[in-house]
């Protein structure tokens, strides 16, 4: 007779256990949560990331103001007139987003990434039982590295002179951090996805699809690449539109 102890231990695992083990044993987490929903983890991440987002609002608001000023200046240099009322309204909404954005953005992001995860799973050969619910559970756990990303932002806000920052990419952990913020916006956005935490999340999704969708381990990296490319579609579109318009 098989030993029921492992199953019992898995049933006793809490959401806190998941938040710890997703860093060290993601396969075990996805295996025991294969039939679980995503709502609880989505709520936890919304609260945690939202709280960190709120704590970093001073840094984020300053960076967003600088980014908007840079874009308005670039538009003026091209002969485009931006009404003062539009500038004031943009900064107002930027301030609201800098304070409360994550409380809305995290759940929406998880639901959208869940759709991308479902499509990725079908592309790499996930089984027929791999549906949106399972895919969104994987997507929710893939957001856990964003907690560390927000903590990294907090540290930078303490150690750096944020008054010199003119682009959000300058406080990111991506390749775009080291590039001129005035370069082609589409290319900058694309290189902004070459980011430690974005890549980490993509790999977690690949692992989740392999475990929950019952694909082979050899398909983890291809799945991670596909979901990364899905996320890069807006940047690629921006790059294409810029090329068609002749934008440098």
Where do the protein language model's features map onto the residues?
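Short hydrophobic/aromatic-rich motifs at helix boundaries and adjacent loops
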Residues: 1, 88-93, 177-181
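Low-complexity, intrinsically disordered extramembrane tails and loops of integral membrane proteins
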Residues: 1-13
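A generic helix-loop boundary/linker signal
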Residues: 9, 16-17, 110, 199
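Short N-terminal micro-motifs specific to bacterial/archaeal maturation
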Residues: 10-13, 20, 126, 211
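Selected alpha-helical membrane-embedding segments in polytopic membrane proteins
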Residues: 15, 28-148
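Membrane-cytosol interface at the C-terminal ends of transmembrane alpha helices
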Residues: 25, 110-125, 154, 199-212
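Hydrophobic alpha-helical transmembrane segments and adjacent short intramembrane/lumenal linkers
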Residues: 133-248
């Amino acid at each position: 007779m098989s030993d029921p102890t492992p199953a019992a231990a898995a049933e006793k695992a809490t959401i806190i256990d998941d938040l710890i083990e997703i860093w060290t044993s993601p396969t075990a987490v996805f295996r025991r949560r294969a039939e679980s929903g995503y709502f609880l983890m989505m709520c936890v991440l919304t609260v945690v990331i939202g709280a960190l987002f709120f704590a970093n609002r001073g840094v984020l608001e300053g960076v967003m103001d600088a980014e908007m000023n840079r874009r308005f200046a670039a538009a003026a240099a091209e002969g485009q007139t931006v009404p003062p009322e539009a500038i004031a309204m943009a900064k107002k909404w930027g301030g609201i987003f800098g304070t409360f954005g994550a409380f809305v953005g995290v759940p929406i992001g998880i639901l959208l990434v869940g759709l991308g995860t479902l499509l990725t799973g079908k592309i790499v050969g996930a089984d027929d039982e791999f549906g949106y619910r399972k895919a969104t559970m994987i997507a929710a756990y893939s957001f856990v590295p964003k907690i560390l990303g927000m903590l990294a932002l907090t540290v930078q806000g303490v150690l750096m002179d944020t008054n010199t920052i003119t682009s959000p990419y300058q406080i990111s952990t991506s390749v775009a951090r080291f590039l001129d913020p005035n370069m082609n916006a589409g290319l900058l956005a694309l290189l902004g996805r070459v980011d430690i935490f974005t890549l980490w999340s993509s790999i977690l999704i690949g692992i989740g699809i392999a475990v929950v969708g019952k694909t082979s381990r050899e398909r983890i990296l291809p799945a991670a690449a596909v979901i990364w490319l899905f996320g890069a579609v807006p940047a690629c579109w921006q790059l294409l539109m810029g090329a068609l318009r002749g934008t440098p």
